[in-house]
């Protein structure tokens, strides 16, 4: 869990561009100086920083040569703020200092005075302290904007000013890193909020409906202008909607609502919202994209989905719910079950224990009034488990440390009520926040057994309720003394904790490096391995199979040795966020680890960031566009990545369900061959990834990383694909006929098409 919780500086708008013809700015992305360590005197304008090193602020300090450095560091820059900046502004009352994103915590000083902390303005005469780094929330992905009255005496107009930035980094990348730092005056356009996703779009009567709010956030200015909305099909360019409203007047704190309705799209569409200010001569433009459904409606007749192989170790509890879609009620049958297993014919849940090793071929059947479906299921009883990537839900990306038992139970029931478990979704995993906080006592009982906090009064009962639904139960800890969120972890209590997990019915353990980095400051490869060996040995001694998820962000090329320490999956990077930049960097970076994925061992590029996420009590719709979400799910499935839903399942909408219940896409992830797709083509903004499948066919995705729709012709042989095969569009579950030597596709910006070639 990179940097614990990060607090999202989230706005309900996407791709905002404010344009003011005469607005001037001072670029701050050059001439910064840097030093490691901490001394509050560094904030003083007269401090001699001649011995400091120059540093770029468009990359973390690790990328600038300060590898593996965590803790305090300072940045300083000297800049003349010209009076004409104020004189030429439409509004002349406030100066804005934007420092981009800072990893993790910051205090910002102007001419020796503290003006801001972690993205919030500091009251005048605030005394700096060290509490700014003591919270459980990191701000590494939040932009830092600080403002002062233009009449503030701390600003030296037409003179040299010193900006000093005190940074504290927990771990991983640190410092200022976005390269877009600047000083500007606040404009009237900064007070207009175009809230286009405050209420998620809805599909009704074969139409898509959206509500847009215009809001004046100022306390003293009236906003006047013209508001226009335009929607086009991103593939064809067809105009889907066009409207202009003139003579809009928004008084301070006033808002107005606009409704948009278009025919339910079956392709990507772009909506542009534009507000033209009458007096300021500026505009605000916001763009977003409409969700569109590609997954066909499930049939009423039975269909068996999910993995065709499952595994357990000899004499360990076995649990498998037959994943079948179709109308209920439904009955189930399993032919040739191994000795020790039993099927509940009404629920489709298989339980028991098998003592003898073997590969057991079982015919599973599902029946309702519309028909019968059957498929072979291989039950592997042996030394290896987790033969297909885990599919489930994890509490972190939505609830963070605000998770509680009620939220977990609700999520488990939604698996059943929304039909997720009918498509193979299995695990219900609690992340950080179930333990006693590190600053409270007692953390353990007199015998050293870990204690749960008041949010989880009965973990065994919770596990039993999850198992009763045919689902599996996961939990979280760290090899250090504390978890990333500052809760009690497993250091020097590994065997006790493993026994506790087993007694609660735990099926999955995420084991997060976190505070173990304070024990091993500069770990060697053997030190990277050590804590995972210790917990692996503890888990093996229990009477349950517990999937072992290593979470240490890819350090030491974990994919090369994760299997050796007993890992079934291992994180390959830091935490993902719901941004295109994060998705692109993490997802398309899974290249060098490709050879190491196989049944029982999976590269984990982190959880899914579709639906409503938020890393705490305040949630928002993902910032990924619909096309980016299609890319997200497609790439993860091609990569044979673990699929862990990270959103609030109680807010599942039709579009997100469409992403999570396409059985032909999920089948790529759950293919028993366990092959991770290879990147075979990089052609400008186009990438092609190809995956070998167990039936001898190949699946491939054509991804467009560019900003515009791409019309692309793929030479099949150059991509390692055989011409003349049967082509199938997997998202639309539609046969496309035989191929020639190439195929031509239109791929929307940040989007994908996924095919199977047989």
List each language-model region with its residue ranges.
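C-terminal beta-strand-rich structural cap/linker in extracellular carbohydrate-active enzymes
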Residues: 738-758
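Aromatic-lined ligand-binding clefts that engage carbohydrates, nucleic acids, or primary amines
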Residues: 52, 79, 84-115, 163-167
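Solvent-exposed, low-complexity, repeat-rich "mucin-like" stalks and linkers
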Residues: 303-327
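Aromatic-lined carbohydrate-binding/catalytic grooves of carbohydrate-active enzymes
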Residues: 125, 389, 397, 411-524
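Strand-loop-strand motifs at the edges of beta-sheets in extracellular beta-sandwich domains
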Residues: 257-261, 340-356
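Glycan-recognition surfaces
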Residues: 493-496, 544-648
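Carbohydrate-binding surface patches
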Residues: 75, 223, 630, 636-639, ...
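An acidic-aromatic loop/edge-strand motif
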Residues: 24, 28-31, 36-39, 52, ...
